[in-house]
Amino acid sequence: MNKIISKKQFSEKVFCIEVEAPLIARSCRAGNFIIVRVDKNSERVPYTIAKADPEKGTLTMVIQEVGRSSTKLCDLKVGDEVADIVGPLGTPSHIENYGTVVCAGGGIGIAAILPILTALKKAGNRVISVLAGRTKELVIMVDDVKEYSDEVIIMTDDGSYLSLIHISEPT
């Protein structure tokens, strides 16, 4: 069983859930994913690992409620447990120092690019991140992205968020 450590609601149907999974947290890499089963009667559903914290032994997922399984997971509270988590699965992304890279994501897709842009920055790249969403509220994890980006561009369909954030001056 894997206990839910924290839960944050980004919008009406989008949640950020952090769960205990120490073995997976220590061995996952950018591009890996997990399969979660909420209870013994639930289906197995794949989710992107948005963040892994090897020291805390936790994984963070961003889930959008769209069906029975995702709703069941999003209905859980801090302290509740999921039946099992399998992973890390998939082939990790190839990461090296390319020089300058651009990472783009929109809506909950921002969670999918976060581990990749983090790994690219740690490999010595200059990272430019482009984030988008229908509204300002749907542009998620901005602070997490800023932490590993040299420049962040944020846009929305409705114009409620249009900015260029220079994290550090280019060298």
Identify the residue ranges that each predicted region occupies.
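Ferredoxin-reductase
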Residues: 1-78
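Generic structural signal for buried aliphatic residues
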Residues: 34, 82-85
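Short, surface-exposed secondary-structure boundary micro-motifs
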Residues: 39, 87-88
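Extended interfacial segments that mediate partner engagement and assembly in macromolecular machines
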Residues: 82, 97-102, 111
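Histidine-anchored nucleotide/phosphate-binding helix
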Residues: 112-121
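Short internal beta-strands
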Residues: 127-134, 154-156
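Helix-rich terminal scaffold detector
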Residues: 128, 141, 145-147
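Residue-level detector of conserved catalytic or cofactor/ligand-binding positions
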Residues: 165-171
